Each structure stands twice: as structure tokens, then as C-alpha cells.
């Protein structure tokens, strides 16, 4: 594993070995064997974070390409029904950012720990509530939350039904959208979304970090 990582990253073998040890000690990798014959597999914890130009994602295959290349390999041991739900929710949210945000960059992330899987899709676009309010001629962005909750509104009628966010918000144990200074969490009264302590979205969306 160290040899492959060294070749792909350009880091020294010592640097790679240190990182592998840190990942194993932290639970992101699981060791097998001892000494120089050690092998590794995915640990109980999983993590991925990517920041890319929106146009670049579209040119490379869109949301399904990101899923197949980045998330699916980290979630191979999920139950098929759970993996299907995760796939739908992630690709729907990423598709929304790609097709509707008009932003330059998209931040995507996943963290799995203690049986709890969290995902993030964020962009630097105009904001979903602001866009809905403008498109529907609403005088207050808060009314956009009501339109969104109905699951029948889309700002791009050609090819979109408006059901993606509606369905995703109900298939997940927790779901929230933050935009234009507002927050939509359909389960906030009963089971509010857990904190995402593993990511700082605002810091991660800095343009200088785009790849």
C-alpha cells in the first residue's frame, strides 16, 4: 500500500508510512498482519472531502461519476438498501447544485463514524431560497421554504420535477438546507440534524482551495 501511495502522491515513503499509521490509529484503516507484511482494509471510520469547479464536475460525468469514483468505493460494505438511499440522496443534492446554483465551485463531503453517516453538498451560488423566491416572485425568502417543502417547485422545469429535495429530505434520518441566512430542517422539532463537527463549510469553500 505504501508503494502505491508513494507513486500516486509523490510523497516520500516515510511520509506515506506516517500517514498510513495515523489513519490506522484513528480507525480509518484496519491493519492485517505484522511487520513488513501488513495489509490494510477500510476501517470503521470513513472520510472524503472534495472541492471542485462546478463545470469540471459536469464535464467529467456529473453526479453519478462523483458517486462511482469517490463515495461508492468507501461504502462497499453498506447494506444494499442503505447504499441505495445514500446514493439517491447524495446524487440528488449534487445534481441540484450542478443544475441550479449557478455557482463556480461545489464542496462535497462524507463522514462515517459510529454507524452514523453524514454527507455535505455546498456551493457558492446564489442560494436556493433566494433563487426560488425570485423565480416564483415571492416577496420573502422564507416563503421559498414552504414551496420547497411541498416538493412540486423547480426553477428548471425542463428535466426536473421538483421532487428531488422533497424525497431526499424524507428518506434520510436527518436533512437540512442552509441558504440566504435561512435554514430548512423538516425534522427539527423531533430529531434535529446532528452537528457536522468534521467540516467547516465556509472555510472549505475558499476559492484558493479549488482543485
Question: What positions do the PLM features span?
Answer:
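Conserved beta-strand-loop-beta-strand hairpin that lines the nucleotide-binding pocket
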Residues: 30, 35-52, 98-211
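Catalytic glutamate of the conserved HExxH
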Residues: 92, 97
